[in-house]
Amino acid sequence: MKFISWNVNGLRAVLSKGFEDIFKQLDADFFCLQETKCQPDQVDLSFDGYYQFFNSAERKGYSSTAIFSRKKPLSVSYDFDDMTDHPKEGRIITLEFEKFYLVTAYVPNSKDQLLRIDYRLQWEQAMVRHLNSLKQKKAVIYCGDLKVAHNEIDLKNPDINHFNAGFSDQEREAFTNLLSNGYIDTYRFLYPDKVEYSWWSYRSRAREKNIGWRIDYFVVSEDLKDKIIEAKIHNQIYGSDHCPVELDIDL
């Protein structure tokens, strides 16, 4: 099975940049989108043979996620079970299938000067609880814009970013904690020394210079380790400040 995850930085915007052709070209069984920045009724989009699921923020034009799936899920849920401490920002979709759960997420940004780091860490803890509750029942595939470059190999300029959002010690430790709960970073599992990025700032011609970060992931529960076939970063595909990432897995 082929899975794609892509932060499109605005679905309506990327539709004018060839999104439908890219979607068909990648030909995935599951296509997960983050930062769609829209309500379902704001886009006229439908692909033959796919079920569509949208989770939109209460604040229009902000955050939000979507999944297109060739398989009909057994169940669909949105956000965490307990949203008492979380604003409705449309960040999570969970689909249940016969053999696995698929979770896509648009992780909260810790902001400049780490102004939102406390909430970010609270959110990370809630996500680990969510994934672990699913993992008790069946295998888990977790993907999305996870907003962290885990190790120095995962960004171009680690030395100047240790106190910046996405590479702070706290965020990196939170990702380490996630993996320690029985999960695998599929790309790094297959390619421990490969340097590729999935996000580039719009500033200073960063993409042209390949001054990037790897912050988009497919993470799977350890029981799927032997089923991983390939993990790719499609850095030749434009349309957003992120590029699509791919997981091929035998399910």
Locate the predicted segments by residue.
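Active-site beta-strand/loop signature of hydrolases that rely on acidic residues for catalysis
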Residues: 7, 23-41, 102, 130-152, ...
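Surface-exposed cleft-lining segments at the edges of enzyme active sites
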Residues: 81-83, 108-124, 160-163
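Conserved beta strand-loop-helix elements of the APE1-like EEP
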Residues: 60-76, 205-226
